Amino acid sequence: MAKKIVSAIDVGTTKIATIVANVRSQDDIEVLGVGVVPSHGLHKGIVVNMEEAKASITESVRDAQRISGMRIDSVNVGVTGRHITSLNNRGVVSIPRDDRLVRPQDLKRVLSAARSVSVPEGKRLLHAIPRYYTLNGEERVKKPVGMHGTRLDVETHIITASVSSVQNLVKCVHSIGVEVEDLILEPLAAGEAVLTQQERESGVIMADIGGGTTDIAVFRDGSIYHTAIIPVAGYQVTSDIAIGLGLPFNIAEKMKKGYGNVTPGLDTSKADEVGIENGHSASYRDLCDIVRSRMEELFELILLEMPTTDYQTLAPCGLVLTGGTANLTGLAELGKSVLRFQVRKGQPLGVGIYGITDILYDAAYATTTGLILWQARNKERSAWQVKRGGILGSFVSLFRRLFRA
């Protein structure tokens, strides 16, 4: 692909990050600038105060423009929240021509058939991602164009979102003079940043533990298989600390980041009492016990969101933890103990992307960098993602028309 400047906004509960990159190819991406500011006006992926959210997004975009030296006119925007739902659906069409040769228009027809699902009122399709194709009900294929058959099937992962929730987010971005070029489900982006191709092929669960939500994605056979959003994440850990130790919320957040450890017995360097500022202190063990308890609960919630209880068959590569809360000391070890299968911390792999190194390998910015990777690889028509446009393009176009009316 030709050199192109692309931008994206990761809109979270605790931070908003705008990233600008020079994309020369899917494996040659230079990050030019990132604007990171505290998030206000959002909760669990949903806009709850339009003016506050708009102000935070404005500040983040301005910082990214200043650092990169580039003007941001359009962006990809990450979408998450409890309103996200998903299912797998199959589409089937016949190949009517005498030569039985599968052509590009046949892929469009079968994908259209797969998208023909009943969507609840107030929701729209966000993504319709082909997982694999079959010809005549036989072997699975990734690229059937040019092959011969009488019947073409596609197994598709369908993701829907609340129209009002997405509309409010798009409106915030549009109101500062920036176009929304595309909407991307955040766990899809995070998966691009932290998962290896082997993990996606063999089967893996990814949990992006952010501030307000834990975004779940299961990958199998090289593509997305299951997605879910859990409204429990880092915010709830901080809230537990504040309530349990009688601390202001901002002090509890600093305590969590500075001393949070789910395996405190392994760290003999910490004093019995830890302090942060303004005379606030707490028992180190009490602090860590609170963090550990909430994380144990979260692991159980992750299992409840799985489509099967046969976890080893579903995900032989285990669980990959990413997001800011994944930086808690000892979290992967706790996960192994609770879940009884492989767990690792998922830092961005940094493959094919370079530039501002302080975020490129930080789990807290997996979604941020992943939004750029998703667009770069999507343009190259990677095996597990559908190209921008179609139903998703109409979703964005609908909002543009509404806001200009």
Go through each PLM region and give its residues.
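Nucleotide/phosphate-binding catalytic cleft detector across ATP-hydrolyzing
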Residues: 1-15, 19-206, 223-225, 234, ...
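Extended, folded domain segments that form the structural surfaces/walls around functional sites
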Residues: 10, 174, 208, 297, ...
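Active-site lining segments that contact anionic ligands and/or coordinate catalytic metals
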Residues: 213, 302, 314-318, 340, ...
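A structural feature that tracks compact, well-ordered secondary-structure segments
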Residues: 215-217
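A cytosolic small-molecule/anion-sensing beta-strand core signal
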Residues: 220
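Nucleotide-binding motor/catalytic cores of P-loop/tubulin-like NTPases across gene-expression machines
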Residues: 226, 321, 325-373
